[in-house]
């Protein structure tokens, strides 16, 4: 499958669906990859079935992409730039965007940094992230510290360690490298792109998702009923709401 270079880091991607279909970038969550997040959950099938051209990215540190052992390689602006580099590599001016969890945080950064490259964006499993302390705990657990008792850290460790493709040190660097101040009200208030925020109503990681949607002008909030952070992804309601939002373009 194809790779491309983004700032000296080799990244893996997948394309699916009709070549002339409206393109959409899919960006997965932390400790996941394109195949796990979007193929096994039948998102690729749903989107290509709706006539869309899917551009699936394995983020740096994940999947089949290169895995730097340096937190500075995982700044959110850098990872948002990777999505732009994919568009450049494919000679596309614009695309829709669908990101989940980490992929949604990357997408929000892209929405404020380079909105001209997107048509509309769906941000799933994202809330009001103020997680510097939690990120440190997750990194410690990924590095083998069994003294960490934080439930989220343990969840991510178990999820990551179960997959041989994962490099736990790269993932620790990734979670540490993404820590930065929240986007301020002025930057969120300047967003003009159509945005939808979608999250499971039982998702503790995406707490504050409705508030985030309220802070973005014109943004839509969709609650995925009865779902948590992990099982919201394959939910039919999530797919239906996303396809409806994309069809409004």
Task: Kindly give the residue locations of the regions a language model identified.
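Conserved HGGG/HGGXW glycine-rich cap/lid loop of the alpha/beta-hydrolase fold
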Residues: 9-66
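Active-site loop/oxyanion-hole signature of alpha/beta-hydrolase fold enzymes
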Residues: 39, 45-49, 56-96
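Catalytic histidine-centered segment of alpha/beta-hydrolase-like enzymes
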Residues: 227-239
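Catalytic histidine neighborhood in serine/cysteine hydrolases
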Residues: 213-230
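Short beta-strand/loop motif that positions the catalytic acidic residue
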Residues: 191, 197-199
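Active-site nucleophile elbow and catalytic-triad environment of alpha/beta-hydrolase enzymes
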Residues: 172-187, 202-204
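N-terminal cap/lid segment of alpha/beta-hydrolase-fold proteins
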Residues: 1-11
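Conserved hydrolase catalytic core segment
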Residues: 93-131
